[in-house]
Structure formats: structure tokens, C-alpha cells
Amino acid sequence: MTFIPATAEELTAEWVDDAMRSVGVLHGDDHVRGIRVAHLSYGGVGLSGDTVRVHLDGEGAGLPETLIAKFPTAVVANRGMIEGFDGYAREIAFYRDLALQVPVRVPGHYGSAMDPARFAGATDVAAKVVNRLPSRAHLALTADITKFMRPTKRRYVLLIEDMGADTVVHDLEEPPSVEQLCQVAGCLAGLHASFWGRQDLADHPATRTLVTEIPRVFVNVLRGRCRPMAEDRWSSWLTDADRRRLDASTDRFAADLGVINEPHTYVHGDPRSDNILFGAGDPIMLDWAMSSVGHPGYDIGYLLGSSLRRDDKG
């Protein structure tokens, strides 16, 4: 398939049919004759991309009524950031190679396509260059880091099973119950256990360590941008103890990064409640763009830190 749709508007019935057939979802007399694209009830436009529901017209026993299509975000800085750690390609690689291996519920892979990377080692080279910069250059770089997050012209599209029927997404303002979070923690533990010590994951495109080889930049961004932003947004309820914790976590961030990157097992990387579908049975884990080899404690800490209700923290 030489043509790759770059946006939902470019999707065609012919392309969807070919994509689904290429991964064995459609067979023989199964055919997609027409499509209708609709936005999801909860928006579908997030930090990293545009997600839509595609209604399928056609015939055949293997033809589902709908599927989900994912595309990169149109926001330049956001896309540059996601491509900085190869997030779009990382998620496609997960669905192509690992989705059937993980012991957690995930949508089925209905097809995908992306342009080849022009230089797969670009982020590694960038990390080496940045690490050699003097401190003053680091500060200048991080003063407005977004202007350096330039996206590529690569096209990415991912088609997955629509599992939205009879499921609920809990956003971060209305997080799930403690019982539901315990379910997710159990699923993550199963994921971590099943991949524990797998040496073959180190160089897989879905599991490579995230671009965290430049901790000085991250620390400067935290100090120069994130910490003041937190003060501006939440100063009315931040206590002195909160501020001390923020400062301490910033100071030790580089060391924490080293622990997070310890290659123990496969981690989801972004298990917030709004990346999980809740319904009958086990939770369904979505959004694998930040998956990597790392420390399992990161997944659990991220889940509880982002999704545990304030009243349940203690």
C-alpha cells in the first residue's frame, strides 16, 4: 500500500479493506464498500493524536460494524514531542508484534501503515550532542523547549478493534474507584511478570528505552518551566509541604530516571485512567505509545499518582 492516509479525512473504503485484509481480519468474500467517520463521544482529540470511530458498510461474516482509527496530532509541538520518543511508530510496532503476547486485554490489530524512518538513530545522536553542551547552552535550550520539537513528515495510521460498547472511560477529573484501580494494578503486575527478564526486548521498536538519555534537559525543563507552571496554576492550594516535595522531586529527578530505565521488564508507560476502558471483565489497556523496557514500579506509581482520588490517598 503506497498510499497512506495522513488524516481521518483521507481514509477510503479501499484502503481500509486492504489494511484489514493484510492482517487477516478480512477473508475471501469479506469486503468494505463504504465508510463513515465519526468523532468519539469523549472527543478523541488528545495530546498525542486524533482518534475516530469508523463505521463500515459492506458484506461478509468477518466485517465488523465499526473500528477505531488513530492518527498523529495536528499540534506541531505536541507531534514533535511524541515523535521525539518515536511514540507513533512505537504503538504501531506494539500492535504488530506484541499485542498477542501481552496477558492483558487490548484491542485487536485491524491494520496499520507508516512511512519508514529516514534515520532511525536520530534521537540517539541528538542525545549525545545535547549532553556535550555547556550548562548555559542547556538553559537556553530549555527556556522554550517546544520550539525544538519539530515534527517530521512521516505518515502514521493505526486501525484497531472498537471495544467502546458497554465500556466507560474515566478522565482524570472523575477517576475510577479504588477497586477498579486494583484491577488495573493486577493487570499491570501480570504484564510485568510475563515479560520479566526478557533480554530479546532490548532492541525491539516497541520496547526501546524512551528518550531519557538527556536528564539534564529534563531537569532544566522541570525547574525552568514545569515548576513555575505548577505554582501559577495551583498556588491557591499548594502548601509549603507540597512545595518542598516538588522541589525535592525535581532535584532527584535525574537519579529517579536511572531507576525508571532499569531494564527489568516490559512496562505500559502511560497507565492513566483515561487510557483504560472499564466494563465487564478485566480492564482494557489502550495507548501503548510510551511502552518500553523499564522498572515495573513506574507503571504502578504512575497509575496511582495520576488516577487515585485525593480522598483515597493516605
What do these predicted regions represent?
Residues 76, 167-168, 276, 293:
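Conserved protein kinase catalytic core
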Residues 80-87, 173-183, 292-295, 311-312:
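Short alpha-helix boundary/capping segments
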Residues 1-155, 279-283:
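Conserved NTP-binding catalytic cores of kinases and kinase-like/nucleotidyltransferase enzymes
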Residues 77-79, 167-171, 285-286:
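Short small-residue beta-strand/loop micro-motif enriched in glycine and branched aliphatics
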